[in-house]
Amino acid sequence: MKIRNVFIGLIVSAVLVGVVSCGSGSGDYGQPPAGGSQPPLEPTLDSIQANVFSMDCVGCHAGATPPQGLSLESADSSYTNLVNVPVPRDTSQVRVKPFDPDHSFLIHKLEGTQGSIGLPMPLRGLPLDPSKIAVIRQWITNGALRQ
C-alpha cells in the first residue's frame, strides 16, 4: 500500500510540474513588447501571433520537441503547423480548416469542446478570453491566410 501511495504522489507531482511549467513563463514570452503596449488584436495571423500565441501558448508550444509537434514560436511556424495540418491523434480532423472554424480542432481545444482528445488549451488552467477566441474564429472564417 505504501508503494502505491508513493507512486501516486510521484505522478501527481509530475503532472503539477508540467502544468506549472506550461504557464506564460518568464522572460520574453508572455510579455508585452518593450517600450509600449500590446498592439490591438485583429483577425490576422501576425496579430494573433503577437497577442495570443506568443503570450499564451509558447510557454509550452516551443523548442525542439513541442507537444504534438505543434510549434507556435513564430507566425511562420504557427501557419506551417496549424493550417490544413491533420491532428496527430485523429487524422480525420485538421488543426485549422480555412473558412470553417467549427471544423477546426484549434477552436475545439480553445473552447474545451475537443472531446476525448487531450485537454482544453491553454493547459495552465485559465481559459483563453472569449474575445481572443472570437478573433481566431474570424481569422479562420476569413480563410486562415498567412499574410
Question: Each PLM stretch: what is its role?
Answer:
Residues 1-43, 137-147:
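Post-cleavage N-terminal segment of exported redox proteins
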Residues 26-41, 46-130, 134:
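Solvent-exposed helix-loop boundary motif
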